[in-house]
Amino acid sequence: MQTSYKNKKVTVIGLGKTGLSCVDFLLAKQADVRVIDTRTQPAGAEQLAKNVPLHTGSLNQQWLLESDLIIISPGLAVKTPEIQTALAAGIEVIGDIELFCREAKKPIIAITGSNGKSTVTSLVAHMVNAAGLKVGMGGNIGIPALSLLEQAHDMYVLELSSFQLETTYSLKATSATVLNISEDHMNRYVDLEDYRQAKLKIYHHAQTAVINAEDALTAMDGLKNGVSFGEDNADYWLKTEKGRSYLMAKDERVLACDEMKLVGRHNYMNALAAIALAQAAGIPLESIRRALREFNGLDHRFQLAHFAHGVRWVNDSKATNVGSTVAALTGLQLNGTLHLLLGGDGKGADFSELASLINQPNIICYCFGQDGEQLAALSPRSQRFSTMEEAINALRPTLSAGDMVLLSPACASLDQFSSFEQRGDEFTRLAKLS
């Protein structure tokens, strides 16, 4: 469904990579484009074409009301009063993913979830590539979706956030999944159900819905085209035979888990979801197997950062919410003590789910950052520090062979770092001093 934007007054809210991709797309379609960014010095302003008007520091209500169409950044809530005023005036408000879906002609595999979505997106793209198809991977990971339209692709694999899905209506995915749902972005949503409903939009018009059999929140009433993944009682499941675990597609053995470079139960679940998505999109099993063997995983996601003196230092800085840390801790094999680094900005989440997992005699918690106090209250074996560096300096002398130091903070990083990547890099730097 291609739409004409010629001479339409379109206001793009939010610059950065995604905003610029919207501007470039709309200019190529001969739209009359204006840009608003609530920041006084927005990233990407210097790359904006000089003939495009830019308003910074606030939402320009007059510009919004003069628009035929508003393209909203996923970072800005639709509930914002100025946006509600525009909607009440009958002005359409959509996001960059909706623009993309109206234009894309090739099959789309769509992935969302509170945790694991970047890993699954990258793994599925690897599977599509292994089948000899030209894959366009983007959305909430790497390249903005609209930028993918600049080159020819056979298939698109998109990671989508709840924020992006809120303003997407025309997505008709070949296969789609909500990997899991746990509290995240509670500072943006009324409650968990509000957040869940945003995620479930990914299933609307999908040919195949891939559902987590272990997470009832990922299921949607009335779905007739679903397949499931989970440890057991699912279409895609784990089979254990003679001490080895195997990834299964219904009755067919896909691969032994120990043949993958990905480790940990949560990654076996990610692999099962990826197999289901790829098979539903027609990717041959042999290509899927090859991709599973080759895939190295992603940085800052349960990544071995350093190994010295028998101690493993594991960087899981991408664990920016409780569910992600729960996934890292579930089924974790330990020989010695786990030194767990927790803390940062909890985004209003309820941390209580962690309590039963971390209240173990072989787990010591080192809590830091904005919500460190709240996290330290979960376990009597917790210590409180201002920064991650202070915590690491305190735990370093206590380490013994067989121990693991795990950064899986259950929080966003922005209280003390520019990004989860910077936090992970700093952890790795400190680990290598050992």
From Swiss-Prot:
GO BP annotations, alphabetical order: cell division; cell wall organization; peptidoglycan biosynthetic process; regulation of cell shape
Similarity comment text for this entry: Belongs to the MurCDEF family.
Enzyme Commission number(s) from the entry: 6.3.2.9
Keyword annotations of the record: ATP-binding, Cell cycle, Cell division, Cell shape, Cell wall biogenesis/degradation, Cytoplasm, Ligase, Nucleotide-binding, Peptidoglycan synthesis
SUPFAM superfamilies: MurCD N-terminal domain, MurD-like peptide ligases, catalytic domain, MurD-like peptide ligases, peptide-binding domain
Role played: Cell wall formation. Catalyzes the addition of glutamate to the nucleotide precursor UDP-N-acetylmuramoyl-L-alanine (UMA).
Catalytic activity: UDP-N-acetyl-alpha-D-muramoyl-L-alanine + D-glutamate + ATP = UDP-N-acetyl-alpha-D-muramoyl-L-alanyl-D-glutamate + ADP + phosphate + H(+)
GO cellular component: cytoplasm
Pfam families for the chain: Mur_ligase_C (PF02875), Mur_ligase_M (PF08245), MurD-like_N (PF21799), NAD_binding_7 (PF13241)
Signal sequence, renumbered to the chain: none
Taxonomic source organism: Pasteurella multocida (strain Pm70)
Residues reported to bind ATP: G113, S114, N115, G116, K117, S118, T119
Keyword Cell wall biogenesis/degradation among UniProt keywords: yes
Name of the molecule in the record: UDP-N-acetylmuramoylalanine--D-glutamate ligase
Primary subcellular site in the record, as a coarse category: cytoplasm
Subcellular location: Cytoplasm
GO MF annotations, alphabetized: ATP binding; UDP-N-acetylmuramoylalanine-D-glutamate ligase activity
